[in-house]
Amino acid sequence: MRFKTIKTAPIEGQKPGTSGLRKKTAVFREPNFLENFVQCIFDGTGGATGKTYVVGGDGRFFNKEAIATIIRMAAANGAKRLIIGQDGILSTPAASHLTRKYKTDGGIILSASHNPGGANGDFGVKFNASNGGPAPEKITDAIFAKTLEITAYKIADEAAGDIGKIGTFSIGECQIEVIDCVDDYELLMQELFDFDAISAMFANGFRICFDAMHAVTGPYATRILEGTLGAPKGSVINAIPSPDFGGGHPDPNPVWASELVAIMEGDNAPDFGAASDGDGDRNMIMGKGSFVSPSDSLALLTAYAHLAPAYAGKLAGVARSMPTSRAVDLVAERLGIPCFETPTGWKFFGNLLDAGKATLCGEESAGTGSNHIREKDGLWAVLLWLNILARDGRDVVQLRADHWRSFGRNYYSRHDYEEIPTQAATGLMDALRAKMADLPGTQVAGMEVNSADDFAYSDPIDQSLSEQQGVRIGFKDGSRFVMRLSGTGTQGATLRVYLE
């Protein structure tokens, strides 16, 4: 194999956020931008020599071109083996599972998650560690440090090969294995859930509408829900992955999944509605005419997880991101299990899962998952819901109503202020932090402030400290509001305000 060493220089703006590096697609297509970052992934993790990686993405615009570049660079950097989804398609949960199942050295996932795609949309590159989870800060910091000093990258002369056909080919000493993107993931789901009970429920007339939002989950949901479990044909809508997600915004919430909402609120609505996002790690749940908030979904799944075979024993614990409502805390207290509060970002759950401290995890941003992989998992959440409904017998609305009667209800909302000037956003947060010490005891709209702090997280496993993770204002009656800046946007700043 012949390869070239191309001279380059550091490019500004390559600091990974909570879920890798996300930018406008046009930025990733600029000369050396992708190549620099990929080389720094290899250099920042001890080099690629002799290593195996999982590679895939959500099918958005520039996915195949980026994978071709990664194949050539991995080969030039001495990688031993690449496992790639056919046509470059791999959901983030499936990539996490493959990383763990085949004991690879990590995964390179191409996605900007729920952000829009297309030539004028967003693109992203994320490195997952060998445990299948998002790289922790010590790794992303090392990658970022390399971006500040890079002088060259390596790339093979040879073309990347055809990833549209299942099989293997080689570039030099690097073997590229193209696999069916669904097979391994479906086998895992069959181990976790009572497929017989779910199939029987569908056979008895239960109906579902799953909106794949023209994103990566389409092939997975069609194969598993319609093919294996017997849901009626057409239950999965918008099932074909599209480079621009059908011109939509693949974010599973009532605004962007309005087609699903209209179906679930219409005449003759199905019994259950669900949607997933760009890379398949988020979920939206609906009953007839009713949206289930992600925070309530996490609480309900925790309360009824024992109905699924994989979670029939006592849960080790549950974890939620700090802005997520405390509904799940009430369930954990009754079950007698610990409830961990972490910063936003799935990577913070990784140590808890690896150490066996938590079984289920969730975020208010529509991500839920468990210890089966090290990522949140949209279709997993849907299947756990179906397992619960099949075994319990109540519908979604009744199950939630009974849950509120038993545990009480946490009223909750989130408000996003997007693409605001970064200086203005940081200035607002700095001003709020400066006032925190004087807030307790003051009145706001007739409510007394009881506490105010800037959330800091000391990881109970490795004692790493993450500071300035969001300002929390607590009131005497138990209400609270939270303000934080998000790390998943591609330009400007996103300010999120949470009310509970």
Regions found by a protein language model. Give the residues of each.
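Short glycine-rich or small-residue beta-strand-to-loop segments that form or flank ligand, phosphate
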Residues: 24, 52-58, 111, 126-128, ...
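Phosphate-binding and adjacent anionic-ligand microenvironments
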Residues: 270-272, 276, 285-288, 310-498
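Positively charged, low-complexity intrinsically disordered leader regions
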Residues: 1-36
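Buried hydrophobic positions in well-ordered alpha/beta secondary-structure cores of metabolic enzymes
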Residues: 19, 55, 95, 108, ...
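Proline/glycine-rich low-complexity loops and linkers
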Residues: 87, 137-183, 287-364, 368-369
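Gly/Ser/Thr-enriched, mixed-charge loops and adjacent short helices
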Residues: 2-11, 32, 119-268
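Glycine-rich phosphate/diphosphate-binding loops that line cofactor/substrate pockets in enzymes
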Residues: 38-53, 195-203
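N-terminal small/polar loop signature for handling phosphorylated ligands or for N-terminal nucleophile
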Residues: 43, 54-121, 223-285
